[in-house]
A protein has these predicted regions:
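Active-site cavity-forming subdomains of large catalytic enzyme subunits
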Residues: 1-16
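Hydrophobic helix-and-loop "lid/oligomerization" segment in the mid-to-C-terminal part
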Residues: 14-15, 19-235, 240, 305
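Mid-to-C-terminal polyanion-binding domains and interfaces
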Residues: 114-118, 125-156, 201, 209-348
Length: 348
């Protein structure tokens, strides 16, 4: 909207009498990319911008985006999913483990040669980011599961863990254990950390309180995420402070995650026609989440591990119909093991 206002002001002042006026609609692909990757609620104007931006992106006018889409093996028209989970992570990867300016250079590329070269570099940085992230996540899980945990938090640190991935790892630990997660990289001169929270715990308030206690040198954030710095000799004190803070607000009861369901569905009702109907409600994202439907009276005919810890299931319904299903990155979790050992059981 700022660009629209500036454009209107320039027009009113006669600037475009001597300069070509840009067609702002042609830039909506970048607006859509930024809106989705910044997790802006897809409501009102933002939803309209993303919906139209995806149409512009499908026209492949931006040479850099076109190259990145092709290098990412996206063969269908881009969706909000592709922006948030395929293209966005590749652009962000160069800032996490490479050169932050490369993402901007790609989006401003003026030749196909330059665009393809930069897209290849972004893909390489993204692969590197995945490897670093997997290593830090593995070490963090080993620490957490290698000893009893006194507090309802996931609190881990390691020497020279890459700062570009600790936020991602914190998010995955939060999802895995359903507790607030704090992940820190111990550097030569200070400790830098990132945290992710669950409902009911305001991380921003926690960080402010810790700074007031002299435990952190820097820090800030909002309810669900925060970043901070501290001296290494304050790690134990900060862990105790954060643990007591969370414990006092959650109480002694075990945290039980809540899965909200939008509707029930039989296996025979899971059809391409239904998927097409639901696609009319896109773009999905923050503020307009995809419908979550629960399959009832399902028999797991077969379950097996595929890829990097994914579980593929073959399901059948009591009134006919069969479908394939995939559960991503859960093979080593309690749910993954339950699926793999289901033995053809019927689930209501």
């Amino acid at each position: 909207m700022t660009i629209v206002a500036v454009n209107r002001c320039l027009r009113q002042k006669g600037f475009y009498k001597t300069h070509p006026e840009p067609k702002l609609l042609n830039w909506l692909d970048l607006v859509a990319l930024g809106t989705v990757c910044d997790v802006v609620p897809l409501l009102g104007l933002n939803r309209a911008f993303v919906r139209q931006g995806l149409k512009v992106m499908a026209q492949r006018k931006n040479i850099g985006l076109k190259a990145l889409i092709d290098k990412s093996n996206i063969t269908e028209a881009p969706s909000a999913f592709h922006l948030g989970y395929v293209l966005g992570p590749r652009i962000n990867a160069c800032g996490r483990v490479g050169e932050a300016a490369l993402g901007n250079k790609l989006l401003c590329a003026s030749s196909e040669f330059e665009a393809n070269f930069l897209a290849d570099k972004l893909n390489a940085f993204n692969d590197q980011r995945k490897e670093i992230e997997a290593y830090v996540l593995l070490k963090a899980i080993e620490i957490l599961e290698g000893s009893p945990q006194e507090y309802p938090i996931a609190f881990v640190s390691g020497h020279d863990w890459h700062q570009g991935v600790i936020g991602i790892v914190a998010g995955k630990l939060k999802e895995r254990y359903n507790v607030p997660a704090f992940v820190m990289s111990i550097e030569a001169d200070e400790v830098k950390g990132s945290a992710r929270s669950i409902a009911g715990i305001d991380l921003g308030a926690l960080i402010i309180a810790a700074k007031e206690q002299g435990l952190l040198t820097k820090g800030g954030g909002h309810t669900m995420a925060a970043g901070f710095s501290l001296e290494e000799d304050k790690l134990d004190a900060f862990k105790k402070f954060a643990g007591e803070y969370v414990k006092s607000r959650l109480g002694e009861e075990k945290i039980v995650p809540v899965l909200e369901i939008d509707g029930r569905l039989s296996v025979s009702g899971a059809t391409p026609a239904l998927a097409d109907s639901l696609s009319e409600l896109e773009p999905y994202g923050s503020g307009n989440t995809e419908p979550r439907l629960m399959l009832t009276n399902v028999q797991i005919k077969k379950a097996s591990i595929v890829g990097s810890g994914h579980v593929r299931c073959f399901l059948s319904g009591d009134n006919g119909g069969s479908i394939k299903a995939m559960a991503f990155r859960i093979a080593d979790t309690e749910l993954g093991q339950a699926l793999l050992n289901s033995g053809g059981g019927l689930y209501n």
